């Protein structure tokens, strides 16, 4: 069984507006059978942090196109995207690159 993890989740570029305007969240993910990965984190975020308009953040089982994801300041595409296994004290940053005009 995977132990609970403490992770910093941050939203920027306007994405924080979907989370009551709160940019930084220090969360404890509960222990579970399988290791925590980004796919599971997104499900947890949708259930526990996302306050409105989930379609602006989630598309299918991933983030919407136009949302940049950084894990410990590295592009998630270099780390396996949804399959990246979270480690205790990881930092995950979601930045919306879509802006109205």
UniProtKB/Swiss-Prot annotation:
Pathway the protein acts in: tRNA modification; 5-methoxycarbonylmethyl-2-thiouridine-tRNA biosynthesis
Cysteines engaged in disulfide bonds, as pairs: none
Cross-link type Glycyl lysine isopeptide (Gly-Lys) (interchain with K-? in acceptor proteins), residue numbers: 101
Entry GO CC: cytosol; nucleus
Stored InterPro entries: Beta-grasp_dom_sf (IPR012675), Mopterin_synth/thiamin_S_b (IPR016155), Urm1 (IPR015221)
Gene Ontology molecular function, alphabetical: protein tag activity; sulfur carrier activity
Protein's job: Acts as a sulfur carrier required for 2-thiolation of mcm(5)S(2)U at tRNA wobble positions of cytosolic tRNA(Lys), tRNA(Glu) and tRNA(Gln). Serves as sulfur donor in tRNA 2-thiolation reaction by being thiocarboxylated (-COSH) at its C-terminus by MOCS3. The sulfur is then transferred to tRNA to form 2-thiolation of mcm(5)S(2)U. Also acts as a ubiquitin-like protein (UBL) that is covalently conjugated via an isopeptide bond to lysine residues of target proteins such as MOCS3, ATPBD3, CTU2, USP15 and CAS.
HAMAP family listed in its UniProt record: Urm1
Protein name as it appears in the record: Ubiquitin-related modifier 1
Originating species: Homo sapiens (Human)
């Amino acid at each position: 069984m995977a132990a609970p993890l403490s992770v910093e989740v941050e939203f920027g570029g306007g994405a924080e507006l979907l989370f009551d305007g709160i940019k930084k969240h220090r969360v404890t993910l509960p222990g579970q059978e399988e290791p925590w990965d980004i796919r599971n984190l997104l499900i947890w975020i949708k259930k526990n942090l996302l306050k409105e308009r989930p379609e602006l953040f989630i598309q299918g089982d991933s983030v919407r196109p136009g949302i940049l994801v950084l894990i410990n300041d590295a592009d998630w595409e270099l780390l396996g995207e949804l399959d990246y296994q979270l480690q205790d004290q990881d930092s995950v940053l979601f930045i919306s690159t879509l802006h109205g005009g």
